[in-house]
Amino acid sequence: MLKSKTIDRVAAAGITLAAAFCLLAMVFSDAIAEAFGGAGVSMEYETELFDTSKIIEIDISMDEDDWAEMLENATSEEYYECDVTINGTTFYRVGIRPKGNTSLTSIANDPDTDRYSFKLEFDQYVDGQTCWGLDKLVLNNNYADATNMKEALTYDMFQFLGADASLYNYAEISVNGEYWGVYLALEAVEDSFMLRNYGVSDGELYKPEGMDGGGGGGFSMNGGGADLNYTVDDLDSYSTIWEGEVTNTTDADHERVVAALQKAGEGEELETYLDVDNLLRYMAVHSFVVNEDSLSGNMPHNYYLYEYDGQLNIIPWDYNLTLGGMGMEAFGGRGGGPGGMSFDGSGSDAGSSAVLQNAVWYSGCFLLLVIALLIAGVYRRRPKIRRRRNRQKALPPGT
């Protein structure tokens, strides 16, 4: 009995120390990043575009016939040439195209609106052109979100916890001088995103989808999609990941991903094969907002997978259906409750589940981050918790 109590006390003390360590790491993250090296790079577009104290003003100028043709053939998602003036600065020969999955097809089938979401690709026609360092800007129409706030609030939470996530701001859009509405502008997850967050742009990036269903590893048996569970060593079994490559990848790159998925699924050397620090922050927000249109939903998609030197990281994407949005009958939702938001090992991401099964990471870090979100909601204005932006392995529990 005495031995049992002693063990319990030691375990409790260990969790308390781990919680204190996590809190100190959040407070002194800049110093940690400097000590470990590999900090992210400050980009000019952070202040030029994503200063949320002021709305972005964007005017798109393009041939009227090209604009009409693009809208008429929106589902082809082909780029057209335009000039874009952002806050008074004009960028010439920019690529523009409609974007989306359900939102794209729904708008295309609606005779009453052409209010698509768009992508602006600044180097589509001019090599090396950027928007203050940004290679691509996403303009979301906040489809199926009557508040026009769900995605913005979610990205604000990610920023507050210091997770690797896109910067955001609202933007007033006009086309050839005609007002087109308010959109949510997002930093695309591409080279400039990697440079800002990791200090390099040579990691491997994927956006798994698999929305057409199929078989083999990488597919969810619950209704299609692209999960992150290890099945076999055969690379072809993970086609939903490779087909979503954003960077140019090779079989050697794919082998590193599969090896990491295997180790993560087995719960082995998690801090070596997963960016545990960022995953805890990602899961805290992700669970808080209940996003079933995601990796943890019935059809896993809407996320980016980043791999560098054999270590995996998850980057969030597409949060307009958070906070019960998937409960809408039109999307076949299950009520928007937390029952479908599980990282318990039975879902589509065994690695994240393994992280939360570690008592120190769960009680000492994950719950602390969720509590921080709750406190921030009560007091509204709050300092942001920074994360050490580097490519070093996450510090092991109890360090």
Predicted regions and their residues:
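Alpha-helical transmembrane segments
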Residues: 24, 369-382
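N-terminal module-boundary/linker segments of secreted carbohydrate-active enzymes
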Residues: 29-83
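Disordered, low-complexity segments in secreted/periplasmic proteins that are enriched in proline
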Residues: 211-227, 326-357, 365-368, 375, ...
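Conserved oxyanion/phosphate-binding beta-strand-loop segments in alpha/beta enzyme cores
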Residues: 82-141
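Internal "kinase-insert"/substrate-recognition segments embedded within catalytic cores
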Residues: 121, 126-127, 163-164, 178-284, ...
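Active-site acidic catalytic loop and adjacent metal/ATP-binding pocket
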Residues: 60, 120, 271-325
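N-terminal Sec-pathway targeting helices
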Residues: 1-18, 357-361, 378-386
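Short, well-structured beta-strand/strand-turn elements
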Residues: 161-172, 294-295
